[in-house]
Design a protein with these regions (language model features):
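Short, low-complexity N-terminal intrinsically disordered segments enriched in polar/charged residues
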Residues: 1-28, 127-128
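Generic anion/oxyanion-binding catalytic loop in active/binding sites
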Residues: 11, 39-40, 93, 112
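A solvent-exposed, acidic/Ser-Thr-rich amphipathic alpha-helical stretch
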Residues: 27-77
Length: 128
């Protein structure tokens, strides 16, 4: 698989909750950097920690959550994904939409780092 195809597979795995596939395409020491101010925003270290602390946690707080991809930018060992989040908070019933960029670094055919850039205020507003 190309690096772009690996990132496309990552989104498929997240969407379908195929956590085994996610673990296969990430380095064990994956660094997953979510915006400070983002719900559970911090640096998650390790692919297993991302599955537990990020992916599975979405179900606790959100009735729906999506990242709609508008564009992939393939820069070799880095792949940038431009899109927008949309979601509806489970406890408040409020919805939101926020533009975002995801930056992935790959090493030897595996995702080694994720960086997120988004407006976190609209997400917090939906939670309160």
């Amino acid at each position: 698989m190309t690096n772009l195809e690996i990132i496309q597979e990552l989104y498929r795995a997240f969407h379908e909750k195929d956590y085994d596939a996610f673990l296969r395409i990430c380095t064990p020491d994956l660094e997953w950097i979510q915006n400070e101010g983002f719900p559970r925003g911090t640096i998650h270290r390790g692919a297993e920690a991302v599955v537990e602390g990020v992916f599975k946690a979405f179900d606790d707080n959100w009735e729906s959550w999506s990242f709609d991809i508008e564009q992939y930018l393939d820069a070799g060992k880095t792949v940038i994904v431009i899109g927008s989040y949309a979601g509806r908070n489970r406890s408040t019933g409020k919805s939101f939409c926020s533009s975002a960029a995801h930056v992935y670094d790959l090493c030897d055919g595996k995702v080694s780092r994720f960086r997120q850039f988004t407006d976190t205020k609209v997400i917090w507003d939906a939670m309160n």
